[in-house]
């Protein structure tokens, strides 16, 4: 590379000056250029301190010469063997050394050095395990051996709790499917699996004291599907081997329909309800030791129905019983406030803050069932867990939650219809590395062109794409590089709540328009696969207006005539609350607000919906093709050369989400990828 670029000193100086001027012009002068090794061997989550060396370490075999952590070294040996790399006395030397590291959260910290040999330092098995997880991410096969980048890492987590939650009370998932996801969690250094075991549709953990909890009469979804006590202990052991703690949740007194039906209680005020629950929490705590399962979650949120109300002291007695088993107690915030409670851990949701003096876990604004695969990843990347750079004695960390409340037809649909795996990868960086600031401006949109923040996102996104291709083959990963896409948008034009009103944009694309005496101009380029004009949770977006009509345009270059697959959508249907703010569109509509899409002046027809015109309260009717990323892609004819894409996105008072997605995709064997030979540009 140097011999090609730098023929002599003069050219080198000119090149250097020009390059730096270019970076200054683009607003990236304060960012280091990525080392080529970093591009080839990206690590997620990003280590706290990392220096890439000069070149790579090639090896045929390995030789673990010393290890103070036998379980971890055995696991590393098994990993290499699975990769086809055996141990031998003349292999590359690997040492795993026990040593106290002078960093925050030293129990999970590690150092990793790769040069002519490999050294790992950690003070605990956890630290050694995370070092090995990092090492596993950067091994590349070459012939009969392997390659590793030369580097030095010192790493530790910003937060002590880095978790993920599944709601199996509403929708059961098999042990195998849970284990698949837990394995991925461990790869990205999560250390908590929050297991929501009970909800209105079912009580999913076997009780030998009250077997009627698993009866078909008590269960409204997935009848006969529950976890035996042996299943439960198996998952706990599987997690423990990966240094993940299970937090089981029995959510009471709300979300208790299955419990009440099973026990024959009309309301939670039935005098038998509390003794029964005390028995159930005793039974739960008896399954696993306090050392291996130190937290118990009792819910207490959303007590909104008369039959869920309880007397004062009800929840306090459950708290006392759980604490008597030497467990830390977790409750949702917002939830029932218990007089005298000063020690419960508050798990935050929506926009709630912790109670003063309480330890807390942050689950605000990161419910995966609401997340679009593109815009949602910006939120997970830029949000600051606990709204502070790192954890402390009160700010314990965060838990990413999946709440697909609606009934699902097949357990795999939970992974197909929610961006589970992309969310795990993006959030892992924020919860391990930490964030210096909470960048609320980018919770619903990507930063503007030529900003440091966009460049930071692009760098991380490139890492995600490498991980997607290396580590998620055969798994649902609905994400492509969205920083490739730039849009000009114009509006909102006043539509007086008439979504069918047409504006001059539909007649000709020109730089500006005058409508009813008001001038409209196309915006500077907006970046992203999904654009929110106004976000449904009120996060900063492109407008503060509640109604109107926007248009968006870009050009796509194709090297040939082709029928190209696109992901197209105008409403991200949250996978909860039925068809929230429905009804679902009828045939011939993209959405009830009548958005339009034209390519080269040809209108693109919406899908032939499998379940058109369903009403809002349709929680029990599973989704099939409601969202763009799990239905068949829209096929659009592209001509050779530049193709003009134009979208119309109206909004009225009856709709909730004002947004669109329109990106070309390459899908093969259910794996989505970028279309590598297409190019994109804005017009204005």
Annotate each PLM feature.
Residues 259-345, 350-354:
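Active-site neighborhood of glycoside hydrolase catalytic domains
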Residues 579-581, 587-662:
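Beta-strand-rich ligand-recognition modules
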Residues 20, 28-154, 331-336, 342-344, ...:
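Acidic, contiguous N-terminal accessory segments
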Residues 560-589:
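A short beta-strand element within beta-rich, extracytoplasmic domains
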Residues 544-557, 630-634:
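Short beta-strands within extracellular/lumenal beta-sheet-rich domains
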Residues 350-482:
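Flexible, acidic glycine-rich loops studded with aromatic residues
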